[in-house]
Amino acid sequence: HLEGTAKLAQEYCIDLLKPMAEKIAKYHDIGKYAKTFQKRLEGASVSFCHAVCGAIAYQEQANQRDVFTPMLTYCIAGHHTGLMDGGTRVDTPEDGTLAGCLKRKEDYTGENDYTTYQEEYLVQPLTAEEEQPALAELLSVRKDPFEVLERYAFFTKLLFSCLTDADFLDTERFCNPDTKRGMQGDFKQALEILNHRFSE
């Protein structure tokens, strides 16, 4: 599923961000390696937030000066719940912010330990070479801090969308392989109807 989601996320993404789409997809479900989550698959009624695990792992492995680490951890941690508030350094693990979630490492020990993924699945954070095109894009507008923030936010939302679509469709392909996808309809007629209604 991680590889399938990574392939789809890259297909949906613009060239500039394809390496990031691949990374978030490969990290997004590593929390499912935890025994607690495996028990859920076997029918146990247990609660387990697997999405945070990938974000914690990514943050631990990434270069701490990498400007894209927050972007990628936002996407990974929120792939089921949506992009959350960033929070602040003083947030606690109980807070529902990204800063709070990333402090929950102690929650993932014992049967909640997900790090067994490392025994069979090799995943690495962004390299300097992979992030260079996106960094160059941000630096091209560095004289306008507002524009830098706008592009950073756009990149985050685009990556998040690529991940959630890819995750859903790869899961659907496994669970319901006969599902037909694609848009159908007479778009020319729909446009005519829309234009007519706006002209009334």
Language-model regions, residue ranges each:
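Accessory nucleic-acid engagement/destabilization modules that flank
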Residues: 1-197
